[in-house]
């Protein structure tokens, strides 16, 4: 499904639209429409750990999110070999509103969410 990015993706400010493809219940990827060579791996944070945060009011307004909206959340992943060494950024989740195909990334404060990290290893959450 193609989404319009309503606020810049950190480090990829030129991306305005991307295709979201779910790989399985844990992983997804986004591919830039204007530059298909840009592909970013995402993880479903809820499949990894207990994860909760408040979506700021300005993001709710930007994405037209209300109580009935179908919203999904993913976090960026830096893939490593082996996969359990890959790192997840829990402090900058991507918010997807499936109702109108819009998305935005937010930056959470470590002060407000001290249990979240920008580079948590997947192996800290996946049981072997």
UniProtKB/Swiss-Prot annotation:
UniProt-annotated location(s): Cytoplasm
Any one of the GO CC terms: cytoplasm
Keywords of this entry: Bacterial flagellum biogenesis, Chaperone, Cytoplasm, Translation regulation
BP GO annotations: bacterial-type flagellum assembly; regulation of translation
Main location: cytoplasm
Organism superkingdom: Bacteria
UniProt keyword annotation of Chaperone present: yes
Gene3D superfamilies (alphabetical): BH3618-like
InterPro entries in the record: Flagellar_assembly_factor_FliW, Flagellar_assmbl_FliW_dom_sf
Family: Belongs to the FliW family.
Biological role: Acts as an anti-CsrA protein, binds CsrA and prevents it from repressing translation of its target genes, one of which is flagellin. Binds to flagellin and participates in the assembly of the flagellum.
Subunit structure: Interacts with translational regulator CsrA and flagellin(s).
Record's protein name: Flagellar assembly factor FliW 1
Organism: Wolinella succinogenes (strain ATCC 29543 / DSM 1740 / CCUG 13145 / JCM 31913 / LMG 7466 / NCTC 11488 / FDC 602W)
Gene transcribed to yield this protein: fliW1
């Amino acid at each position: 499904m193609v989404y319009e990015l309503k606020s810049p993706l950190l480090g990829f400010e030129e991306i305005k639209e991307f295709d979201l493809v779910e790989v399985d219940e844990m992983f997804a990827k986004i591919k830039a429409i204007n530059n298909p060579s840009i592909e970013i791996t995402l993880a479903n944070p809820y499949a990894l750990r207990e994860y909760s945060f408040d979506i700021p009011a300005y993001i709710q307004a930007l994405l037209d999110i209300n109580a009935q909206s179908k919203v999904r959340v993913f976090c960026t992943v830096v893939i490593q070999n082996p996969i359990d060494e890959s790192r997840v950024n829990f402090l900058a989740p991507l918010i997807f509103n499936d109702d109108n195909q819009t998305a935005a990334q937010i930056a959470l404060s470590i002060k407000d969410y001290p249990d979240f990290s920008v580079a948590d290893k997947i192996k800290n959450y996946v049981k072997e």
